[in-house]
Amino acid sequence: HILILNSYHQEMTWVKNLTQAVQDVLDSDEFNTIFHIENMSSKRHYNEQYFDSLFNLYGAKYKKIPLDLILSSDNHAFNFLRQNTRILFPKVPIVFSGVNYFKPEQIAEYPEITGVTEAFSDVDTVKAMLKLHPETKDIFIINDYTLSGKAWTKTMLDHIYAANLDTQVRISFAE
């Protein structure tokens, strides 16, 4: 029994592709894999009451299912599992993916958790743009307005300012 816990809703291309890829790789008659897929839809619903409801739902739903593995995608699922795994899924191995701003100490007390982080090179990207197009005066960045989109914007600005790239080119974001 493998639980795939996605942070977002099932209609997002990223979620569809990731879920399908996991099933394609791990679905085998040899292993008789049974998948359980949960989509937290946390870009649409993000408050303490909602996460409490998910805690209660998953507790009831998986109480008698002997999970062998949990695969989580993105920060909300990762954070939810870190906060609740010892109660909901004690000793079940967890592999996360797509986690932003990861620090090893986040899982230091969780030997059952491992995974792959998500990182991008914003400063290197801007430097490459300026090297390829030295006449550039303005860079306009398009991002979404979700919680993670706003966090990316802040992080990018912090990195760009720290590298003094804002003195070479004007950076603006879609507002």
Residue ranges and their predicted role:
Residues 1-175:
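Short hydrophobic alpha-helices and adjacent helix-cap/hinge residues
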